[in-house]
Amino acid sequence: MRIVLIGAGNLATQLGKALRGVHHEVVQVYSRTKDHAQHLADLLNAGYTDSLDQLVPDAECYVFAVKDQVLPAVIKQVCGLYADGSSALFVHTAGSISFDVFPKETKYYGVLYPMQTFSKQRDVDFTDIPVFIEGNSDETSNKLEVLAHSFSKSVYRLSSADRRYLHLSAVWACNFVNHCYDVASEVLAPIGVPFEVMLPLIDETARKVHELSPREAQTGPAVRYDERVMNAQLALMKDHPMLQDIYRLLSQSIHENSRHADMPTCRHLDIST
């Protein structure tokens, strides 16, 4: 399939490599930053442009992998230029945006959402990445399914309404968790302990949920309702009231989700120190 890749960021970079790896032809890369477009195009042996009105007009698929904030405007402009009478697929890759962002005059449009965290500098194997698709018709969905199956063995059809919850779940499981890693790193820095000491703990925590439910795998002072430990740790964060608030709320949530009926609640946890 001849594909135009609109975007040159983290997802666009890794998706472009995956598509080329299974013998699709990425014919062109667009980015509003010309150097970014050229860099990715060089990796994919493709043409490049920083102007939407200079896209290849006869591609079979236009993949939008740009920031959510600009996606509607970019889609409107591209479809206005190229969609009328076209048999090409027009698809975006955003987890949180509905497929009806496409103009209705577009014949074939939808969503192809690979649920994974992506970075330009870290290559990933798309084979096991779940890909969620949605098309504006059965014909479109079938085309998207074939495209997705060309690089992933885990392809699911999911509506825009349900994909909102999938994306929310991913934010909890990935983005918030990574922020906690960052907080942990900041806690260690003043005492000169490298973040690498946390990696075995992080790895085992991730491995456990392959065998146990997250609730069964939960450990820590909030589960045990260990007020002494929790209040002592809150005291260590006395100069960081936002972190205290986060610690308190997470501890309350953990405890409420895991406690037995005969265990006390920790909603009165003292955080005044």
For each feature predicted by the language model, list its residue ranges.
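Rossmann-like NAD(P)(H) cofactor-binding subdomain of soluble oxidoreductases
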Residues: 42-123
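Short, hydrophobic beta-strand segments that form beta-sheet elements in well-ordered domains
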Residues: 27-31, 89-94, 112, 131-133, ...
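Short polybasic linear motifs
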Residues: 259, 263-267, 271-273
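Short, polar loop motifs at secondary-structure junctions
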Residues: 32-36, 94-98, 138
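Internal alpha-helical scaffold of NAD(P)-dependent oxidoreductase catalytic cores
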Residues: 36-43, 123-168, 173-210
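Interdomain hinge/lid region at the active-site interface
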Residues: 189, 203-262
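NAD(P)+-binding Rossmann beta1-loop-alpha1 motif at the extreme N-terminus of oxidoreductases
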Residues: 1-54
